Amino acid sequence: VSLISMRTAKVTVMAVALLNVSISANAISFFKKKKQNKNTTAVVKKDAYERILTEEKTDSAKGPFISLYRTNEKLLVELPPSSIGRDMLIGATISSVSAPQFSELGTRAGSITHIRFVEKDSSIVMQAVNTEMLDALPTTNAKQAEEINYRNLDFFSFPIKARNKKTGGILFDASSFFLRESKYFPVITKVAGPYRVDADLRPEWIKVTELKAFENNACVKMERNYVTNMSGNSGNVAISNYPVSIGVQFTLTLLPEDKMIPRLSDTRVGYFLTPKSIVNDSLIEHTSFINRWRVEPKDPEAYFAGKLSDPV
């Protein structure tokens, strides 16, 4: 065998060996990559509802008819489908005050309002329910006329932020109502003795202090800080840039679907009355009802038979 042939054989053997090493290395690398891919966890994308309530620090109060969330200086409300269109009452009460001449402790800020939340387009609308006209047995034409002439008032509109895919609940931003001054729920008095009061409230001066939610009611407690001015009729300024801190509690109550029977007023005194218009034989009569607690006999038959019955 020639020297050239031996050298050629050695080169061939070395090339084959190097090729085997290269193939083995590639195979090991391939299997490692394959194993690593098996252990990789897929990133789950959050929907809009989850992002809003998890990306920022959130305080919450959850109930069966409403849930409240405070996040990123906003107040969010979630209503389940069963609460949309339901009758509710909302009101505001003064819970604390730094200067009683500007607001009286324990009094209501505005009137208790009968409302409903309804969905319109991409918003949730708070409606003030119009119950001025009462018609027990309306005809089709009369019902249409009453709906046009005594329609509900669109009180506030809130943008829908997200929907809960699990429950169908609607999440919306209610900051424009709770965290702003409202002429329907005035906190600061407009007149203090002979002086006119002007108050300035800014969103950054409002702090939500507590959220609560129960079976059929919920409340939002907050602290509002105002800068006030008092001036007389002649324009002279009595107090200028006076800071006032007031605690306000908004309460929302879910009304029962089984409505109570109203009671007509009479000549007796000592009752608070609510005026109404009633349709009677195609005529509109003006009357009033007594404001009373819902106390009804548990056993109506026993009650009307003159026997005792527990109230419900």
Residue spans for each PLM region:
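Bacterial N-terminal signal peptides that target proteins for export
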Residues: 1-13
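Intrinsically disordered, low-complexity segments
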Residues: 3, 20-24
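Bacterial N-terminal signal peptides
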Residues: 13-20
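Boundary at the C-terminal end of the N-terminal hydrophobic targeting segment
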Residues: 25-29
